[in-house]
């Protein structure tokens, strides 16, 4: 009897994760096999940034919400947290947790607000140090900060540094601090006219190495009129604008990039245009040398989700959702996802795609390559499907 029950459960799981690919192979990962790496007391997480170092140490940055008022949707007590483990222990990871910043916390001279949350880590491998960029809320509003972390002990440095942005307009170079006023000045100086409102700029969750530089692409959280800005850096702190992407006419709230043969592939979630038919995930292609638009951004997915790109074994892959993270059944939210992984051609169009349906919500992807293998971190609510504010960080190897 037990064997019958087990067989029935396995069959149901197989149906729940029914996958298809144009070409016949299975989806590159089974979400049920992913290991959970977020803090065990985690109640909510909707960010994931991952760095895999040479020795196999994995650092996953995310946010943790100890208290959440699910009635009015307001957050409190949010912490920026880093989970550390090693790939050799992937099946049963031994995890170390480091808190970067808490609400009301302080590093050096920067005092985090007692009432506003701290947000969104973006990890940068600085060689002998791990650098964590994150959002604090201080005297100048949202501020993008950087703090160094000892990769062995996970101890934090005793000071934070503000991230700067340098750009050129009419032959004149300007440098602003990545604060609310600074980023607004950047947009005004480059001539963005329909900038509706400001929250905070959002870099890609990981930095991309190309030649002597690290590259990133910056969007802006839910701000109509915002456009992506491709930047480069050597230290993860001082960012220099290479070119902007005004072709993303519906804005770019959250972005990701991959670079191949001096072509810069950019994928972005729209910044909530008033015309809901325009909302979704868009893909574009640019020349890294002069910023020429080689493929005008086109809608690759009809649902606003936080996508990612990965250059792996000479191929560019895109991952994003193709339906909402929840549906309403009998007056209640039921969470599930349909995930698509697409292989991108040289011109930025889709060559082929894999899809998988999950019985729970999966989103916020970050793909990494390490020694010829591909890995994925993402946010999921495997055990907490009843509430969208609850989530876990999961990690798995991709079969690419």
Label each residue range with its predicted role.
Residues 116-118:
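Elongated alpha-helical scaffolds
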Residues 361-365:
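C-terminal regions of proteins
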């Amino acid at each position: 009897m037990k064997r019958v029950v087990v067989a029935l459960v396995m069959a149901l799981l197989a149906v729940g994760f029914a996958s298809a690919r144009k070409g016949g192979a299975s989806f590159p990962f089974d979400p049920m096999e992913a290991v959970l790496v977020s803090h065990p007391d985690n109640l909510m997480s909707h960010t994931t940034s991952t760095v895999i170092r040479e020795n196999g140490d994995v650092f996953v940055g995310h946010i943790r919400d100890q208290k959440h008022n699910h009635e009015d949707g307001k957050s409190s007590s949010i912490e920026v947290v880093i989970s550390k483990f090693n790939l050799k222990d992937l099946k049963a990871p031994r995890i170390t947790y480091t808190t970067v910043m808490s609400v009301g916390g302080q590093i050096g001279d920067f005092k985090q607000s007692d009432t506003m949350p701290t947000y969104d880590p973006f990890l940068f491998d600085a060689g002998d140090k791990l650098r964590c960029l994150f959002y604090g809320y201080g005297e100048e509003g949202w501020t993008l900060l950087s703090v160094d972390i000892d990769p062995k002990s996970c101890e934090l440095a005793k000071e934070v540094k503000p991230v700067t942005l340098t750009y050129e307009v009419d032959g004149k170079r300007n440098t602003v601090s990545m604060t609310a006023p600074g980023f607004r000045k950047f947009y005004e100086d480059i001539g963005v006219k329909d900038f509706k409102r400001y929250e905070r700029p959002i870099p890609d969750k990981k930095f991309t190495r190309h030649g002597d530089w690290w590259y990133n692409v910056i969007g802006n959280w839910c701000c109509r009129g915002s456009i992506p800005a491709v930047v480069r850096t050597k230290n993860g702190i001082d960012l220099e604008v290479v070119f902007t992407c005004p072709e993303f006419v519906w804005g770019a709230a959250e972005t990701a990039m991959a670079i191949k043969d001096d072509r810069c592939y950019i994928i972005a979630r729209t910044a909530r245009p008033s015309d809901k038919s325009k909302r979704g995930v868009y893909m574009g292609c640019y020349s890294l040398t002069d910023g020429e638009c080689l493929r005008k951004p086109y809608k690759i997915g009809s649902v606003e989700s936080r996508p990612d790109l990965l250059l792996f074994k000479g191929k560019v892959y895109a991952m994003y959702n193709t339906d909402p993270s929840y549906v309403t059944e009998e007056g209640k939210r039921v969470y599930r996802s349909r995930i698509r992984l697409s292989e991108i051609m040289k011109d930025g169009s889709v060559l082929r795609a894999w899809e998988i349906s999950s019985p729970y919500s999966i989103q916020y992807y970050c793909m990494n390559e390490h020694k010829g293998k591909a890995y994925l971190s993402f946010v999921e609510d495997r055990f907490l499907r009843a509430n969208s504010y609850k989530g876990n960080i999961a990690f798995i190897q991709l079969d690419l």
